[in-house]
A protein has these predicted regions:
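Conserved short strand/loop->alpha-helix "switch" segment adjacent to the catalytic nucleotide/phosphoryl-transfer site
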Residues: 1-20, 24-36
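Short beta-strand/loop element within the Bergerat-fold HATPase_c
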Residues: 33-45
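Solvent-exposed beta-strand sheet faces enriched in polar/charged residues
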Residues: 39-41, 52, 88-90, 100
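A generic structural signal for beta-strand entry/edge sites
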Residues: 44-48, 94-96
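Glycine-rich/acidic phosphate-handling loop/turn and adjacent ATP-lid/helix
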Residues: 46-73
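Conserved glycine-/histidine-rich ATP-lid loop and adjacent helix of the Bergerat-fold HATPase_c
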Residues: 74-84
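Glycine-rich ATP-binding loops of the HATPase_c
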Residues: 83-90, 96
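Short C-terminal beta-strand
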Residues: 94-105
């Protein structure tokens, strides 16, 4: 069981929703079906979420720091600025988004 502060849980809901929408809209063009999955890990000091798909992957020149995608800019801001975490997007048999966030030592607001 994982109990998260309400703000962290809300941020993660937005992030996961946005990543799934990106997979559906951009990853499976011209295909009838595809796979989207989510893997989570907990460590003593944080959480790792990895959302993945088996779609066409990111463009060769993709750069998260230079993206014009509003959704990805929002994700980047939520992860880094609001939750003090890190995000990586990379190709591996489709697209993978790896998000690492620290645990809140105070427990946050519920």
């Amino acid at each position: 069981e994982v109990i998260l502060p309400s703000r962290t849980a809300s941020n993660l809901a937005v992030i996961i929703n946005e990543l799934i929408l990106n997979s559906i809209e951009h990853g499976f063009e011209g295909r009838q079906q595809g796979l989207i999955g989510l893997h989570t890990e907990e460590s003593a000091d944080g959480y790792v979420l990895e959302l993945y798909d088996n779609g066409c992957g990111l463009p060769p020149d993709f750069d998260l720091e230079k993206t014009r995608s509003l959704g990805l800019q929002i994700i980047r801001t939520l992860v880094r600025d609001d939750m003090g975490g890190e995000i990586e997007l990379y190709n591996q048999q489709g697209t993978r988004a790896r998000i690492s966030i620290p645990k809140n030592p105070e427990g946050g607001e519920y």
